[in-house]
C-alpha cells in the first residue's frame, strides 16, 4: 500500500481498464497518481450495440468459431433461453452444450474460452469515465484475428485508441505487433523502455521535492 502515492498504474487489455479505473478512484480520494499506462487497451472502432439482435449475431459468430476451432457441430442456439441470462450465464450455457455434444475438449481450453469471452464483454460494456491526468496508451497495430472474428468492430482502430474523448492529456506510443503479442518480446521492450524513462523522471521529481 502506497498511502497517498505516488502511484504508477499499468495494465494490459482488461488490466489497462482496471488501472484506469483505479487511477480515477485514487485521484478522487486525493492520492498522487503519477503514471497511468494502458498496454493495448484499445476500444472498438465504433460502439458495440447492446441489443437483442447483436446478442444473437455474437453467438452465431461464436458457433462458427467453435466449429472451426474444435471441429464440433454446435447444437441450435436457444436464443430465448440465452436472452434471460447474463454474460456469465450465456457463455456457461454454450460451453456446457459444446461439452455435452461429446467432443473431447480439455478443461483448460474451455476455461480459457470462458474467461476470454467475459473479459471481452467487460471491455465492450464498460462505462468509461473522464480522467484529467496524463495517460499513456501503448498501442499495437491491430487485434488478433480471433478477437476480430468475435467482434468485427475491433478491426478498426482509431488513432487515439478510442480514448481521446475521455482523456485530455493522452500520449500514444506505437509498439507494433498484435494485441496478444504486446506483452511479449520485442514489443514489451518498447513499453519497458518508455516506462523506465517515465519512472526515472518520477523518482527525480520525488528527490527534488524531498530536498526542498
Regions flagged by a language model, labelled:
Residues 1-212:
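A hydrolase-biased, glycine/serine/histidine/acidic-enriched motif that marks catalytic-domain neighborhoods
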